[in-house]
From Swiss-Prot:
Cysteines engaged in disulfide bonds, as pairs: none
Region (Disordered): 90-193, 279-309
Residues modified as Phosphoserine: 185
Subcellular location(s) of the protein: Cytoplasm; Nucleus, Nucleolus; Cell projection, Dendrite
GO cellular component terms given for this protein: chromatin; cytosol; dendrite; neuronal cell body; nucleolus; nucleoplasm; nucleus
Region (Necessary for binding to ITPR1, CEBPA and p53/TP53 mRNAs): 145-351
Modification type Phosphothreonine: residues: 248
The keyword Cytoplasm is annotated on this UniProt entry: yes
Changes after translation: Ubiquitinated upon prolonged exposure to genotoxic stress, which leads to proteasomal degradation of ZNF385A and releases p53/TP53 from cell-cycle arrest target gene promoters.
ZnF region ranges: Matrin-type: 74-98, 201-225, 261-285
GO MF entries: DNA binding; mRNA 3'-UTR binding; p53 binding; RNA binding; zinc ion binding
Descriptive protein name: Zinc finger protein 385A
Organism: Homo sapiens
Basic and acidic residues bias (residue ranges): 103-121
Length: 386
């Protein structure tokens, strides 16, 4: 019984507490390999002293994914174009399209900015009075109310003469933006226009933009530019007239938009400078200047043949003889003609020349035959082989 109990109770502790198994090998802790390159490369103690090639290999092998750098945005704000590289941007900036846009913007700024107008950000020059939106300097309250200025005010001193009053009419005097009347023609206006054209590389007369001063000089020496200048001044074959009639000596010159132009070479009349430029560029005007015939007229003319030309020459040679015969008729010639007509009744009779002196025909002296024998015409002769 005791042995049996011992044998039964023996295996129970083995089932209740499993035996502790000792690992055959000591498992060391696995080293973590993070994705960042700095801790990974920190494993190598001599990384800082390595060769650059080895550093590059280790960085490529153990380093993390390369971060994509954001590409800088390269664009042209004037032309509204975006580029993929700096070389494309430089090529665009050197091109004609960008240059034309820049010149147009500069020309618009120059037109809008006159000498009497200043930009909002520009400082006011010393001694200048502020102006309102209409370009007229504001007057003091005392002047608006009808009262004169103070005795010591700089507006009007006792010894200074008062300027003459000028009626403000919109017909005779044109006021500038600064409030002063603009003169009709300035002596230095042409020089200022030439300097402005050289600065902007733009011909305002022909509406042509160029890329260099040499091209501008070549354009100014060209035929088209000179022809338009002559048309405006009226010195060349193209004359300018006002639309409503001939110009009055006392009236100022009409602007170019209100004038018509007549080309005396081609006998063509146009109503504006745009049509004049088109006509000057046409083949018809160029051929007319070169002295060539008008192709539109010569196209419809038929070439005359050699027979017609010979007949014309013969008629021109016989015309004086027929005129002389009509003026001084000889009896012998008239008798010979009548005899020839009697001998061959089917022969064609020449048309008599029209007499220069209108009146009743004188037939009696002309019908008398001339003295002497008259040779009659022979009859037809037939040739036969037999």
């Amino acid at each position: 019984m005791i042995l049996g109990s011992l044998s039964r109770a023996g295996p129970l502790p083995l089932l209740r507490q499993p035996p502790i198994m000792q690992p055959p090998l000591d498992l060391k802790q696995i080293l973590p390999f993070p994705l960042e390159p700095a801790p990974t490369l920190g494993l190598f103690s001599n990384y800082s002293t390595m060769d650059p090639v080895q550093k590059a290999v280790l960085s490529h092998t153990f380093g993390g994914p390369l971060l994509k750098t954001k590409r800088p945005v390269i664009s042209c704000n004037i032309c509204q174009i975006r580029f993929n590289s700096q070389s494309q941007a430089e090529a665009h900036y050197k091109g004609n399209r960008h240059a034309r846009r820049v010149k147009g913007i500069e020309a618009a700024k120059t037109r809008g900015r006159e000498p009497g107008v200043r930009e909002p950000g520009d400082p006011a020059p010393p001694g200048s009075t502020p102006t309102n939106g209409d370009g007229v300097a504001p007057r003091p309250v005392s002047m608006e109310n009808g009262l004169g200025p103070a005795p010591g005010s700089p507006e009007k001193q006792p010894g200074s003469p008062s300027p003459p009053s000028i009626p403000e009419t919109g017909q005779g005097v044109t006021k500038g933006e600064g409030g002063t009347p603009a003169p009709a023609s300035l002596p230095g206006g042409s020089k200022e226009e030439e300097e402005k054209a050289k600065r902007l590389l733009y011909c305002a007369l022909c509406k042509v933009a160029v890329n260099s001063l040499s091209q501008l000089e070549a354009h100014n020496k060209g035929t088209k530019h000179k022809t338009i200048l002559e048309a405006r001044s009226g010195l060349g074959p193209i004359k300018a007239y006002p639309r409503l009639g001939p110009p009055t000596p006392g009236e100022p010159e009409a602007p170019a938009q209100d004038r018509t132009f007549h080309c005396e070479i081609c006998n063509v009349k146009v109503n504006s400078e745009v049509q004049l430029k088109q006509h000057i560029s046409s083949r018809r005007h160029r051929d007319g200047v070169a002295g060539k015939p008008n192709p539109l007229l010569s196209r419809h003319k038929k070439s005359r043949g050699a027979g017609e030309l010979a007949g014309t020459l013969t008629f021109s040679k016989e015309l004086p003889k027929s005129l002389a015969g009509g003026l001084l008729p000889s009896p012998l010639a008239v008798a010979a003609v009548m005899a020839a007509a009697a001998g061959s009744p089917l022969s064609l009779r020449p048309a008599p020349a029209a007499p220069l002196l209108q009146g009743p025909p004188i037939t009696h002296p002309l019908l008398h035959p001339a003295p002497g024998p008259i040779r009659t015409a022979h009859g037809p002769i037939l040739f036969s082989p037999y």
